[in-house]
Amino acid sequence: MAQHTVYFPDAFLTQMREAMPSTLSFDDFLAACQRPLRRSIRVNTLKISVADFLQLTAPYGWTLTPIPWCEEGFWIERDNEDALPLGSTAEHLSGLFYIQEASSMLPVAALFADDNAPQRVMDVAAAPGSKTTQIAARMNNEGAILANEFSASRVKVLHANISRCGISNVALTHFDGRVFGAAVPEMFDAILLDAPCSGEGVVRKDPDALKNWSPESNQEIAATQRELIDSAFHALRPGGTLVYSTCTLNQEENEAVCLWLKETYPDAVEFLPLGDLFPGANKALTEEGFLHVFPQIYDCEGFFVARLRKTQAIPALPAPKYKVGNFPFSPVKDREAGQIRQAAAGVGLNWDENLRLWQRDKELWLFPVGIEALIGKVRFSRLGIKLAETHNKGYRWQHEAVIALASPDNMNAFELTPQEAEEWYRGRDVYPQAAPVADDVLVTFQHQPIGLAKRIGSRLKNSYPRELVRDGKLFTGNA
């Protein structure tokens, strides 16, 4: 594999020599950092099993190597990446997999270790959504996830990835993560804090990642991380699990942050060792039971993961002074909800008791029941999935609801050819050779729902959202 030139500040190299255990070679570390990062994907088990995915993609000649800490994760090698980017494959467009760095799959593996089955989870720094979507798959779309992102520009990307993967149990917020300890104390069974960091572990992906690095900036970042983990710990219920992770390598932003939390709450913090998380985990194990992953150990990004349990309650923080504002939604009455459910079933959309119908003006939404306890405590950017808009003749079903709720085995499902599916993703109307019978057509490809179309004569009117329309080469190889 070709090498690339990474910029290393001298002070960084000195720090790494001190931080690296004697069992590891510093020369191996430098060599690993110079190698480009292996690409990796995670199969979205909300839509397809790993076995079915492997069978579906077998004809492509992809080399898929299992990732030890994630059953649905694979390193991927392809011969035709230049001809067809991985993100333009049919399987990616329909949400069958997520392009995710292998080491970033570790925190969620740790969160669900030992058969942990949380019902209400928070992802404190969620964009672009790799870990939120991984959490949702582990929860099988049950329970509820609060996915927070401080950067306004990244909330849109976060929602797009959640929608593409067919996820229905997520509420999005846009806050500084330091507010949650006061706003929603002891409300979560599990919390993932993948903290903002100096990014020392990503040099294989970005050779210039350390251009602005300095020991002083590490100290400033660590101070913010301590405030974030303190807030997250307050938001965690007694008995709950907190996973703290970063993509950096210095001890100040990693071990020291966790040790600070334990020193602050000595009777409430228990470190849960991760040495048995997967075969070979002990190669990265620290004496506290954390995983400090240098890039040469597993040939991946540098990463850090710690798992903690909150063993007892701690003193509450002062209540926040901000006002949440009026919640603009109201629950749909049972009788009307039954009518809506029946109409939705007619076009192949079904949901279970984990979701409840709410209304705002002419909009119909499905919210995860597990998030209702947070209403009035935080302001949501987006909650659940938008099911439909009502109009005089019935309902205008929404694309995200189709992707999350539709059954490809429904009576109105219509399977497209590869050429027809590509036209659909380009936002064009489709003229199938054999016209479907139904007026509202659930469009599928590879037995996966990809949208809802109106049949007008021999034409299927495209309803694919404009912001998702793709140009350039797609999976049939035509531009």
UniProtKB/Swiss-Prot annotation:
It comes from the Bacteria. InterPro entries: Methyltr_RsmF_N (IPR031341), MeTrfase_RsmB-F_NOP2_cat (IPR049560), MeTrfase_RsmB-F_NOP2_dom (IPR001678), Nol1_Nop2_Fmu_2 (IPR027391), Nop2p (IPR011023), RCMT (IPR023267), rRNA_ssu_MeTfrase_F (IPR023545), RsmB/NOL1/NOP2-like_CS (IPR018314). It is found in: Cytoplasm. CDD domains: AdoMet_MTases. One of its GO terms (cellular component) is cytoplasm. The active site is at residue 247. Its EC number is 2.1.1.178. GO terms for molecular function: RNA binding; rRNA (cytosine-C5-)-methyltransferase activity. Disulfide bonds: none annotated. S-adenosyl-L-methionine binds at residues 125-131, 149, 176, 194. Keywords: Cytoplasm, Methyltransferase, RNA-binding, rRNA processing, S-adenosyl-L-methionine, Transferase. Its main location: cytoplasm. It catalyses: cytidine(1407) in 16S rRNA + S-adenosyl-L-methionine = 5-methylcytidine(1407) in 16S rRNA + S-adenosyl-L-homocysteine + H(+). GO terms for biological process: rRNA base methylation. It is an enzyme of class 2 (transferase). Specifically methylates the cytosine at position 1407 (m5C1407) of 16S rRNA. Belongs to the class I-like SAM-binding methyltransferase superfamily. RsmB/NOP family. This is Ribosomal RNA small subunit methyltransferase F. It comes from Escherichia coli (strain SE11).
